[in-house]
């Protein structure tokens, strides 16, 4: 899940997303109907998840600690309800129930991530391969395939090995490139005969900005003046260094897969990026430029190297020597290193031009010289969800997809996350908690926006809703719920379909 804690600016309003209609489910009144049949033949629908947010079993089956285990246990004050992912949604034990839910809804695919430390407890081959971890993922993959659900596997969704953090500061060191490649190769060898779609990294933007600029996410590094109250870090350099190494690790892994595995296994490999859409705060060239810089610093940071072999000119100009350089060989390696792009979209912001800073407190959060806010003249850009950063703005989905088409050569895209949350209101009876009509409206409008982009030529091949289940939402803990299926955290993590799950079942009828 993309958690946008690093976004500078923004006014926190406590709007309810939309009033739940007590008389029954949202029926799409006033909106065109939409269903699976509206989309091109072969278009894939699925749900998405991640290992730390879902699995639990943190100390079971030979799994080693990740940076999120350390972060949540050492800094519970950085999580809204002081919680952690020790049990999470307990998919480590309940994965068969999860697959049954997908099958019942008619989903075609399931995007999940592998826990690096469940495969390599110490992060590297030298620490040994954990056969129990291999067995767990084999069981999950085989269960999915037996129910007709395609696995889409993400290799890294933010839970890097604590052992490598201790050894060489994790993604701040180029040493991680080979360790990641070794881990990826084990996954290709063990699972690639059945897995036809691989994603190397999930949202490097979120990992680097929240982990190294604001310090709100693991590993919790930032400059002393940033909001994360970190004991160590450099918000003006480390985000760029960590993501530079992620791009290089991605490219090396793609090269490995294409050289040794793709011809035999006949799979595809890509990377998942996140982007908001950015609307100029007012009609002016300076604000138009601010909106362009905002998308460069969130999306172009990764997309430009993947398409053109270097960072955006706006980043080169504003970040200067704090932004790492690619060698000629690295530039060639990164350029074109994907079969598809995964794209996560949730929300939009207004972008307002900021004057240059004094250059003393350099930080990724201010380098773009764009003030980002969900509110203009007291009016939000769209209804606000439970997460303070998430404003509902469906037209931004279409705008972003057409921006990708027009600026980056219309690559093959899978929407790897899209969704909305509600507050975890513990006083609601179960039957009331299952009434998530605002989520149905969110999906209906975003799927219409997606369909419009496809009809205008956007090369989108699939869509994954975030999320199958309620889960551990990073710094929000369990205070918000993104699931289309309810998880009862007080009764054995039992799952109950929300209204949105029933809506998807009707939507997906063939």
Swiss-Prot record:
Q: Which domain of life is it from?
A: Eukaryota
Give the annotated active site. 203 (proton donor), 417 (nucleophile)
- Which sites does the entry annotate for glycosylation? 122, 229, 361, 371, 425
User: What S-S linkages are listed for this chain?
Assistant: 208-243, 222-230
Cited Gene3D superfamilies: Glycosidases
Q: Write the Enzyme Commission number(s) for this entry.
A: 3.2.1.21
Effect on the protein upon substituting residue 276 to M: Decreases the kcat/Km values 2 to 6-fold depending on the substrate
Localization recorded for this chain is: Secreted
| MF terms in GO | beta-D-fucosidase activity; beta-galactosidase activity; beta-gentiobiose beta-glucosidase activity; beta-glucosidase activity; beta-L-arabinosidase activity; glucan exo-1,3-beta-glucosidase activity
Major subcellular site: secreted
Example GO biological process term?
A: carbohydrate metabolic process
Please provide one cellular component term from the Gene Ontology annotations of this protein.
extracellular region
Q: Which reaction does it catalyse?
A: Hydrolysis of terminal, non-reducing beta-D-glucosyl residues with release of beta-D-glucose
Keywords assigned by UniProt?
A: Disulfide bond, Glycoprotein, Glycosidase, Hydrolase, Secreted, Signal
UniProt signal peptide: 1-24
Tell me which residues bind a beta-D-glucoside. 53, 157, 202-203, 346, 417, 466, 473-474, 482
**Pfam families for the chain:** Glyco_hydro_1
Q: Which InterPro entries does the record associate with it?
A: Glyco_hydro_1, Glyco_hydro_1_N_CS, Glycoside_hydrolase_SF
Family according to the record: Belongs to the glycosyl hydrolase 1 family.
In UniProt terms, what function does this protein have?
Hydrolyzes p-nitrophenyl beta-D-glucoside, p-nitrophenyl beta-D-galactoside, p-nitrophenyl beta-D-xyloside, p-nitrophenyl beta-D-fucoside, p-nitrophenyl beta-L-arabinoside, cello-oligosaccharides and laminaribiose.
The name this protein carries in UniProt is: Beta-glucosidase 12
Organism, per UniProt? Oryza sativa subsp. japonica (Rice)
């Amino acid at each position: 899940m993309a958690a946008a804690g690093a976004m500078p600016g923004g006014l926190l309003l406590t709007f309810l997303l939309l009033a739940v209609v007590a008389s029954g489910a949202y029926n799409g009144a006033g909106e065109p109907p939409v269903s699976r049949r509206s989309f091109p033949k072969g278009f894939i629908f699925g749900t998405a998840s991640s290992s730390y947010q879902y699995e639990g079993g943190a100390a079971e089956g030979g799994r080693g600690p990740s940076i999120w285990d350390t972060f949540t246990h050492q800094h519970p004050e950085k999580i809204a309800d002081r919680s952690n992912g020790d049990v999470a949604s307990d998919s480590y034990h309940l994965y068969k129930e999860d697959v049954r839910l997908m099958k019942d809804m008619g989903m075609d695919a399931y995007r999940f991530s592998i826990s690096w430390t469940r495969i390599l407890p110490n992060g590297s081959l030298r620490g040994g391969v954990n056969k129990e971890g291999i067995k767990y993922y084999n069981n999950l993959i085989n269960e999915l395939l037996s129910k007709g659900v395609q696995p889409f596997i993400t290799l890294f969704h933010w839970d890097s090995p604590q052992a490598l953090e201790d050894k060489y500061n994790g993604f701040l060191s180029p040493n991680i490139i080979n360790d990641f490649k070794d881990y990826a190769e084990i996954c290709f060898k063990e699972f690639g005969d059945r897995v036809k779609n691989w994603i190397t990294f999930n949202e490097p933007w979120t990992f680097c900005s929240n982990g190294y600029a604001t310090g709100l996410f693991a590993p919790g590094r930032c400059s002393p003046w940033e909001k994360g109250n970190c004991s160590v870090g450099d918000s003006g350099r480390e985000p760029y260094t960590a993501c530079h190494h992620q791009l290089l690790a991605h490219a090396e892994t793609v090269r490995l897969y294409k050289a040794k595995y793709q011809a035999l296994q006949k799979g595809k490999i890509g990377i998942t990026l996140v982007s908001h859409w950015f609307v100029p705060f007012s009609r002016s060239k300076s604000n138009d430029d601010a909106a362009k810089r905002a998308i460069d610093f969130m999306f172009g940071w990764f997309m430009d190297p993947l398409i053109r072999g270097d960072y955006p000119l706006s980043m080169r100009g504003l970040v200067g020597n704090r932004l790492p350089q690619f060698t000629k060989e690295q530039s060639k390696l990164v350029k074109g290193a994907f079969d598809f792009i995964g794209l996560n979209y949730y929300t939009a912001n207004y972008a307002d031009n900021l004057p240059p800073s004094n250059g003393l407190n350099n930080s990724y959060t201010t380098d773009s010289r764009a003030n980002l806010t969900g509110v203009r003249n007291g009016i939000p850009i769209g209804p606000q969800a439970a997460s303070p950063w998430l404003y509902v703005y469906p037209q931004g989905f279409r705008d972003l997809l057409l921006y990708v088409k027009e600026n980056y050569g219309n690559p093959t895209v899978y929407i790897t996350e899209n969704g909305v949350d509600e507050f975890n209101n513990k006083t609601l009876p179960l039957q009331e908690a299952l009434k998530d009509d605002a989520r149905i409206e969110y999906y209906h409008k975003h799927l219409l926006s997606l369909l419009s982009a496809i009809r205008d030529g956007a090369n989108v091949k699939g869509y994954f809703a975030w999320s199958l289940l309620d889960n551990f939402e990073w710094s929000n803990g369990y205070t918000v719920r993104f699931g289309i299926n309810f998880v009862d955290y007080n009764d054995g993590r039992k799952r109950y379909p929300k209204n949105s799950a029933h809506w998807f079942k009707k939507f997906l009828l063939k």
